[in-house]
Amino acid sequence: MSAPTILIMAGGTGGHIMPGLAVAEVLRERGWRVLWLGNPDKMEGRLVPPRGIELVPLRFQGVRGRGAAALLKLPFLLARACAQAWRRLADIRPDVVLGMGGYVAFPGGVMAALRRMPLVVHEQNAVAGTANRWLARLARRVLSGFPGVLPRGEALGNPVRADLCALPEPAERYAGRSGALRVLVVGGSLGAHALNTTVPQALALLPEQARPQVVHQAGEQHLPALQQAYAQAGVQADCRAFIDDMAGAMAQADLLICRAGAMTVSEVAAAGVAALFVPFPHAIDDHQTANARFLSDAQAAWLQPQATLTPQWLAQWLGQRTRQELQAVAGRARTHALPRAAAHIADVCEQAARRAS
């Protein structure tokens, strides 16, 4: 008997691709054949093939925010992508199709539904993306990382790395710590200019004996400017382009200052670390603010809009934090973790395939 086949559709950003890869790994361990529908010219073209997963090419990208000329081309681009997806699905004949978001998932999902192939959709963010809002109407099962995102949605969580889920409980990690608070600042692989400029200036406003120990990840492109910003502020910090062991860095931190992508928020909960979220203000539909509120509304994190993140505000806010308070917030964050999300999404895919057979 041949192995069952799943076609995963995801692309454009790591927030769609990485959770898809986590589900792919679970299904491969269960004996499934995994194929990936994506644009070889985009991020999935760099991330998926090195994992030993065949990338089935489909070139399609969104036109939102690209102007009137791009919008006029949309019907032609979409028709071409749908024709490509129809042929790819005919060749592959997958037992189930999983859409994890990104524009490339839309034509593939529509064609899968027209071919009456079981379609499962997973939305990572607290505000559904354009493709998933439409595909949810066609899907057999609708899954999400956060509650209340889509009609018929089942909140199974976002797949996160096992090393984060395996960290000891916050009470155990924070116990016995003394001295300056340990702050981890993460701007993502490309850095975050607002954090890179505001944090050094804020720390300079604090008395030297009240300053936390800082590890600040800025992205390779922004590292020299970040180091200069700390030097000009007269503040010592461990500035890094990348952090290879993010689980270890989170385990050592009393506080994380970061953006609020869906995966970041889910990782904060999985690790059980206190976080100050500064959502990226230009995210589509302001979805990062909605992501952050999943924890901040439960007093399991803090949320500060970038527009009001000033050095003066941040200095005052940091000066008011205690390790005991941070431990309590970290503990509340951990209660919102869904560490088996990847396995549960894989379960749903298997169920959908069985019901269609």
From Swiss-Prot:
Where in the sequence is the signal peptide annotated?
none
Q: What class of enzyme is it?
A: transferase
List ligand-binding residues for UDP-N-acetyl-alpha-D-glucosamine.
13-15, 125, 161, 189, 243, 288
InterPro entries linked to this entry: GlcNAc_MurG (IPR006009), Glyco_trans_28_C (IPR007235), GlycoTrans_28_N (IPR004276)
**According to its record, how does it sit in the membrane?**
Peripheral membrane protein
Taxonomic superkingdom? Bacteria
Q: Which family, according to the similarity comment? A: Belongs to the glycosyltransferase 28 family. MurG subfamily.
The identity of this protein, by name, is UDP-N-acetylglucosamine--N-acetylmuramyl-(pentapeptide) pyrophosphoryl-undecaprenol N-acetylglucosamine transferase
Q: Which organism is it from?
A: Bordetella parapertussis (strain 12822 / ATCC BAA-587 / NCTC 13253)
Q: Recite the lineage of the species.
A: Bacteria, Pseudomonadati, Pseudomonadota, Betaproteobacteria, Burkholderiales
The gene name reads murG
